[in-house]
Amino acid sequence: MAGTSDTNWRSYVGPADNGKLVTSEDWQAPSNPREWDDLFKCSNVSNLTATGLVIPASREDSIDCVRGNAYSFQSCVIEGSVTVKGAIDGLKLYNCVVSGTVELGQYDNYWSKGRAPTRNVSLVNCCSPDGEPIRVKLWDAEMPTLQNTNVKLIKIPKWIWLPYFLFRRLTNPKAV
C-alpha cells in the first residue's frame, strides 16, 4: 500500500534477529489475523528458521520476507500467501502446507534496476491442503528448486514486470 505503513503481527529484523529460531512455543497467531497486513514479516535477516508454526491468512501475506539470506520454514502450515522479495539469497520451505500463492521477486521498496534477483529458493516436500498444485509466481527471481512438490509455475515476463517495477519505483515515496 503505497504511502502507508504495513501493520505486521510479528517482525524479525536483522541484525538483531540473525540466527533466530522461532518455534511453535514462541509463536502465537493473532485472534484477528485479517486485521493485520503481514503476520510473519522478515527484513534483512540472515539464518532465520521457523519450525512447526501455523500462520493464518491475513490482509496481505502470511509470510513476507524482504532482503536477507538463509531463511528456512520447516513443517509449517501457511494458510495464506508467501512473498519473497528484495534480492533474497536463500529461502527454503520444507515439509510445509501452503494454501496461498508463493510470489518470488515481487516489487519492494529497495528495488533498483540491475539489482540481483531473488534466488536460491527451494520448496521441498510441500503441498497444498487440497492436493492441488501450489501456485508459484516468478517476478524478478530465478527458478526455484522443487523437490517432491507439485506447483503451477507462473512466470511473469520481464517486459511486464520491469515497467511495473520502474513505475512503482518512480511513484513510491517510501523507495529507498
Name each region found by the language model.
Residues 1-7, 17-18, 44-54:
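Parallel beta-helix/beta-solenoid
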Residues 8-42, 57-67, 78-85, 99-118, ...:
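Extracellular beta-strand/beta-solenoid scaffold signature
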Residues 47, 52, 69-70, 75, ...:
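Detector for repetitive beta-architecture
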Residues 116-161:
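Leucine-rich solenoid repeat scaffolds
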Residues 154-176:
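Membrane-proximal basic amphipathic "stem/tether" segments
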